[in-house]
């Protein structure tokens, strides 16, 4: 594996972290955090390989890029490989990273199968649960505004994420499958989603390697939302040979098929669970059947690996959204750490037309945030280390 930071670079990185986010160091003294994020921690510390790397070493017999294979054929190969991957990954972790250096990469791998399926899901597009059917490979954008091009607006070491994640090698992709009226990243998600830099998957891999070598604890795929970019992100893993945890930072409004493609590749999940009901989701983000889809996928993510769930407290929405969200988390994702976020501010359409959305036209009050904390405390949710 590539060495990360050396000498003065390591000292500078440590000093910066200590001065800017000392909690990013002290959080690992919390035994609950370390236990619940144990896989992520091991990959972050280079004690275990990231899942995507191991997926490149699991061979498959057929050429997944062959036009002779139907999607049904590919899914059969995928699901068989998924079962094999669990024991394959466990065996490699038991022997350590040096085991990988003794293996030869196969002609075609489990990762290749995922890549092939992902591109087929683009045309007509059914990657997210809008299932808009856009012919993206023909250059026709979906509801998310993304077509066949990989668009990145920025990438950097994010110092404002949850303590276990900082510094986070964050990549902001253009476009989003939500239409949130209060979006704080509305410029890249809705207004000018295609004005970023157009990259190839190879170039995206270079960005990830650069971020890791300069001290990133993880690669944080975000946006907008990264979901429309799944095919490009998966292909970038073919060219990425540095060990780094992959983090999925998303609204989770994706199909089961898309979730299956991600599940054996992502090391830590950072999903949003925004709303406690479908009415609020439709009125504020213009998505249907939100509750069933988001909770289904977050439950799958929880069962697949380490997870920190985010919930943004909206003004006037504690009873309709915050309470049911936290109650669901306590019942269904007991290992999750939860970031109860208090930084909502009116942006985008709400800021320009507060009369249209008076319920969310202000910041949350202190008593609303404190009520959210009391609800979480009563449910036994662990939120303080990451909120």
Residue ranges and their predicted role:
Residues 115-131, 148-185, 338:
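N-terminal pre-triad scaffold of radical SAM enzymes
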Residues 201-359:
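Conserved AdoMet/S-adenosylmethionine-binding subsite of the radical SAM
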């Amino acid at each position: 594996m590539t060495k990360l930071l050396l000498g003065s670079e390591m000292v500078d990185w440590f000093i910066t972290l200590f001065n800017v986010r000392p909690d990013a160091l002290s959080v690992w003294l919390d035994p609950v955090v370390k236990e619940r994020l144990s896989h992520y921690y091991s990959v972050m510390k280079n004690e275990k390989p990231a899942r995507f790397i191991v997926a490149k070493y699991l061979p498959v017999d057929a050429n997944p890029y062959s036009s002779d294979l139907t999607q049904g054929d590919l899914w059969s190969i995928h699901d068989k490989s998924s079962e094999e991957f669990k024991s394959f990954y466990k065996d490699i972790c038991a022997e350590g990273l040096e085991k990988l250096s003794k293996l030869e990469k196969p002609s075609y791998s489990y990762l290749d199968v995922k890549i092939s399926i992902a591109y087929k899901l683009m045309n007509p597009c059914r990657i997210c649960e809008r299932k808009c059917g856009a012919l993206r490979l023909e250059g026709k954008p979906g509801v998310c505004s993304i077509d066949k091009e990989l668009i990145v607006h920025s990438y950097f070491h994010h110092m404002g994420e949850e303590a276990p994640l900082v510094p986070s090698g964050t990549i902001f992709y253009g476009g989003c499958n939500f239409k949130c009226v209060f979006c704080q990243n509305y410029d890249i998600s809705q207004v000018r989603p295609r004005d970023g830099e157009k990259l190839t998957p190879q170039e995206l891999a270079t960005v990830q390697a650069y971020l890791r070598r300069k001290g990133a604890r993880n690669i944080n795929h975000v946006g907008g939302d990264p979901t429309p970019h799944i095919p490009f992100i998966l292909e970038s893993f073919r060219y990425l040979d540095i060990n780094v945890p992959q983090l999925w930072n998303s609204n989770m409004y994706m199909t089961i098929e898309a979730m299956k493609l991600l599940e054996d590749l992502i090391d830590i999940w950072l999903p949003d669970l925004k709303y406690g009901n479908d009415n609020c989701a439709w009125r504020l983000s213009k998505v249907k059947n939100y509750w069933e889809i988001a909770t289904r996928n977050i439950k799958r993510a929880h069962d697949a690996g380490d997870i920190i769930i985010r919930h943004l407290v909206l003004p006037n929405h504690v009873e309709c959204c915050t309470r049911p969200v936290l109650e669901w988390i306590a019942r269904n994702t007991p290992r999750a750490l939860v970031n109860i976020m208090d930084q909502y501010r009116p942006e985008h359409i709400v800021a320009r037309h507060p009369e249209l959305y008076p319920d969310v036209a202000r910041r949350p009050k202190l008593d609303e945030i404190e009520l959210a904390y009391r609800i979480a405390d009563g449910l036994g949710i662990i939120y303080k280390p990451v909120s």
